[in-house]
Amino acid sequence: MDELVVKDLIDRLIDLSFAEDIGDGDHTTLSCIPADAMGKSKLLIKEEGILAGIDVAKEVFHRFDPTMKVEVFIQDGSHVKPGDVAMVVEGKVQSLLQTERLMLNIMQRMSGIATMTHKYVKKLEGTKTRVLDTRKTTPGMRIMEKMAVKIGGGCNHRIGLFDMILLKDNHVDFAGGIHLSLIHISEPTR
């Protein structure tokens, strides 16, 4: 998939997530943290696994507040263990507090998928079998979940209905059988 399309999908998910979580403002943070307060926060790893979502996390911070500084110590695809520091983020405390939960949710989900994928990939080493993903993803998070599969060593099968023909039972049933399905597939569709 085109990198600009991927970036657009990620940006839209981030914007939707901010609207969902922050709404008209984080009333707690805005009422008790001075606007000029500066701070630093680190992403401390709590479980062993494969790290995924660093680039998306950086986009979360910069999309909310372009002045935030992010220093990355561990890249996507790296094996991590409890106590590792993946990154340090520095900037306005209000910005740090309003972005932390979205960043954590994304990274935890992506790292969980990458870790599980990696476990299956390791079990299949030495065979000709590959781990492929499906379209059965969380609505709106498909691109990130598929990125996580790749980071974990798996392969992306197809992104959506648009990038290949995959004849399934429902198609065969509605087309009137496998033979008719195949005839229709060989005809131009557009």
Task: Mark where each language-model region is.
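Acidic/glycine-rich phosphate/pyrophosphate-binding loops and surrounding catalytic core
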Residues: 2-182, 186, 190
